[in-house]
From Swiss-Prot:
UniProt function note: Catalyzes the conversion of acetate into acetyl-CoA (AcCoA), an essential intermediate at the junction of anabolic and catabolic pathways. AcsA undergoes a two-step reaction. In the first half reaction, AcsA combines acetate with ATP to form acetyl-adenylate (AcAMP) intermediate. In the second half reaction, it can then transfer the acetyl group from AcAMP to the sulfhydryl group of CoA, forming the product AcCoA.
Gene Ontology CC annotations of this record: cytosol
Gene Ontology molecular function, alphabetical: acetate-CoA ligase activity; AMP binding; ATP binding; metal ion binding
UniProt-recorded name of the protein: Acetyl-coenzyme A synthetase
Source organism: Nitrosomonas europaea (strain ATCC 19718 / CIP 103999 / KCTC 2705 / NBRC 14298)
Chain's gene name: acsA
Residues noted as binding Mg(2+) in the record, renumbered to the chain: V545, H547, V550
Record InterPro entries: Ac_CoA_lig (IPR011904), ACAS_N (IPR032387), AMP-bd_C (IPR025110), AMP-bd_C_sf (IPR045851), AMP-dep_synth/lig_dom (IPR000873), ANL_N_sf (IPR042099)
Post-translational modification: Acetylated. Deacetylation by the SIR2-homolog deacetylase activates the enzyme.
ATP-binding in keyword set: yes
Family: Belongs to the ATP-dependent AMP-binding enzyme family.
Lineage start: Bacteria, Pseudomonadati, Pseudomonadota, Betaproteobacteria, Nitrosomonadales
Positions bound to ATP: G392, E393, P394, D416, T417, W418, W419, Q420, T421, D508, R523, R534
Binding of CoA, residues: R196, G197, G198, R199, T316, S531
The UniProt record lists the keyword ATP-binding: yes
């Protein structure tokens, strides 16, 4: 990779307020440095101490890091635990009646669920799963609305040792099908419909469509939560109502005591080539990362009301809805709806109503709320807030400043968190009582995380120069492998051409400034980041080419002030180059086709038609040139070898 020049020059810096520092879990820079040096001095001892402090073990571990077969690292692998017990049972003796979840529906109905009640619901459902023959090691796909029941389903799987794979409710039947097939799922947990922004979206019908695609005989049970009460098709031998399944089940369910390395879940994330990657996470190491980051980054206090707006279909919803807050004993808000329904101030109303202290959302949401004006948040009482967080993509400095000044009223630290589906929890983020923040920077690695910026051989790059972001040592919360694809795991994350395969390759480019702060510059592969969601170009291109009108397609990202990036598709048709009216008709058809094949999130913002696509002599599509066309930039590449230079003009036209 050629050296990347940083074009962002941001000099503003915000030290934490003295009152915040005084009450913080990591209080002052010295506290951060002490932990960082502990990890540097005794790496395995550092993680062992944290694992003993934050995790309740059924059988204590004696071995910390097993690195006998790199990069397939194992942590605490002779210990045993249960994740659900750590999230629920351990709190019953001291805070059974504390509110675990405040749920607010799309329509505004509010339900408070205590730790005692959540434990009871999880045990009922776990016993129901067992009654269907679902056992430890079985894979269960969860395709649910953003409700308490989604968390119950995940926790129930964890309780019996089943491996869950949650699919975002906006994904299509084909996406659900691919994940069912790859996971070899025994069961699917879903609902009749989901409600978002006043609109009803089918879930059970989508599951039925997925299961009708063939080769799904492994699925013996479909469990359906009755949400809207709409009519659905039913297969009596296969389908089970949630309420029937839990009826009469005992209030207790003995947890399965599993090995620390037993998979807790797989979560499918987009890759730059081919099918989605089934990221496989362990139990103990993953939970340790979720809990320590709640403590360090979110500075958790017992009276906090925590709200992470992410859906459980994404890793943020796993770590900071389903597991992290519950493991640390927090009260959190789960919201079913959208930021602006039924009115533009819905988010601010929720913060005011529930006295939220910690608010964690995506730059996409922040940018869309900025569009509505600064006077809107000012109409609500946001004085309960003490900490703001950003997740999913780098936040541009001006959005950071709006978030800090308008929402946080210039008194709440902003924690800009860099991490990935594969890392399981925060990697680079400010401990808000210890680290000064800079708009647009995720600041410094957390204690125990050895992050660096290197060139294509693994050597450090100069300060201010761009390079590959890597993590040089294994860490407990990292993915263990890709489901059924260990070789792809090795090649993707530990390529031998970078430091001999010793470093975890994040796939992001970054640079460090004079203070050692990290600045994320974007992806180095062909994965797009649309509204904080990673989408593989190969998947979208494959969907386009599957349409009978399309001969060839290439997809790139284009910066967008609200979504971060949008999808721009360059398409060659099987018919002649269409006129404007025909092009508009085809573009509309292809947009809906992609939405049905993958999901609405992947729908191209722009589609451009050409007689062919620009390629190198070896036949590779010239993606850099396409990116320049998409962004309206001056083309600096040598285009003299193009067989048909007129295509550049054709591909500059947006439909």
């Amino acid at each position: 990779m050629a050296t990347i020049e940083s074009i962002l020059h941001e000099n503003r810096i915000f030290p934490p307020a003295s009152e915040f520092v005084r009450n913080a879990n990591l209080s002052g820079r010295e506290a951060y440095e002490t932990l960082r040096q502990e990890a540097e001095h005794d790496y395995t001892g550092f993680w062992a101490k944290l694992a003993q402090q934050y995790i309740a073990w059924h059988k204590p571990f004696t071995r910390v890091l097993n690195d006998a077969n790199p990069p397939f690292y194992k942590w605490f692998d002779d210990g045993e635990l249960n994740i659900s017990w750590n999230c629920l049972d351990r709190h019953l003796a001291t805070q059974a009646d504390k509110t675990a979840i405040i749920f607010e529906s799309d329509a505004g109905e509010v339900n408070h669920c205590s730790y005692r009640e959540l434990h009871r619901q999880v045990c009922h459902f776990a016993n129901g799963l067992k009654s269907l023959g679902i056992r430890q090691g079985d894979r269960v796909v969860i395709y649910m609305p953003m409700r308490i029941e989604a968390v119950v389903a995940m926790q129930a799987c964890a309780r019996i040792g089943a491996i869950h794979s949650v699919v975002f409710g906006g994904f299509s039947a084909k996406s659900v099908y691919e994940r069912i097939i790859d996971a070899g799922a025994s069961a699917v947990i879903t609902a009749d419909e989901q409600i978002r922004g006043g609109r009803y979206h089918p879930l059970k019908a989508t599951v039925d469509e997925a299961l009708a695609m063939g080769d799904t005989a492994t699925v013996h049970s479909v469990i359906v939560f009755r949400h809207t009460g709409t009519g659905i098709t039913w297969q009596p031998e296969r389908d089970h109502w949630w309420h029937d399944l839990i009826a009469g089940q005992p209030d207790e369910c003995e947890p399965a005591w599993i090995n620390a390395e037993h998979p807790l879940f797989t979560l499918y994330t987009s890759g730059s080539t081919g099918k989605p990657k089934g990221v496989q996470h362990s139990s103990a190491g993953y939970l340790l990362g979720a809990v320590t980051s709640m403590q360090w980054v979110f500075d958790y206090h017992a009276d906090d009301v925590f709200w992470c707006t992410a859906d459980v279909g994404w890793v943020t919803g796993h770590s900071y809805v389903a597991y992290g807050p519950l493991a640390i004993g927090a009260t959190q808000v789960i919201f079913e709806g959208t930021p602006t329904h039924p009115h533009a101030g819905r988010f601010w109303e929720i913060i005011q109503k529930h006295r939220i202290t910690t608010f964690y959302t995506a730059p996409t949401a922040i940018r869309s709320l900025i569009k509505l004006g600064s006077d809107l948040p000012a109409k609500y009482d946001l004085s309960s807030l003490r900490l703001l967080g950003s997740v999913g993509e780098p936040i541009n400095p001006e959005a950071w400043m709006w978030y800090y000044t308008v929402v946080g009223q210039s008194r709440c630290p902003v924690v800009d968190t860099w991490w990935q589906t594969e890392t399981g929890c925060h990697m680079i983020a400010p401990a808000p009582g210890a680290i000064s923040t800079k708009p647009g920077s995720c600041t410094l690695p957390l204690p125990g995380i050895d992050a660096a910026v290197v060139d294509e051989t693994g050597h450090p790059v100069e300060q201010g120069k761009g390079g590959f972001l890597v993590i040089k040592r294994p860490f407990p919360s990292m993915l263990r492998t890709l489901w059924n694809d260990p070789e792809r795991f090795r090649k993707t994350y530990f390529p031998t051409d970078i430091a001999g395969g010793r470093y975890y390759l994040a796939g992001d480019s970054a640079h460090r400034d004079q203070d050692g702060y990290f600045w994320i510059m974007g992806r180095v592969d062909d994965v797009l980041n649309v509204s904080g969601h990673r989408l593989g170009t190969m998947e979208i291109e494959s969907a386009l080419v599957a349409h009978p009108l399309v001969a060839e397609a290439a997809v790139v990202g284009k910066p967008h002030e609200i979504k971060g990036e949008v999808v721009v598709a360059f398409v060659t048709l099987r018919e002649k180059l269409p006129d404007d009216q025909r092009a508009a008709e085809i573009a509309a058809t292809l947009r809906e086709w992609v939405a049905s094949e993958i999901g609405a999130i992947a729908r191209p913002e722009e589609i451009r038609f050409g007689e062919n696509l620009p390629k190198t002599r070896s036949g590779k599509i010239m993606r850099r040139l396409l990116r320049a066309l998409a962004r309206g930039e001056t083309i600096t590449q040598d285009v003299s070898t193009l067989e048909n230079p007129v295509i550049l003009e054709q591909l500059s036209q947006t439909v």
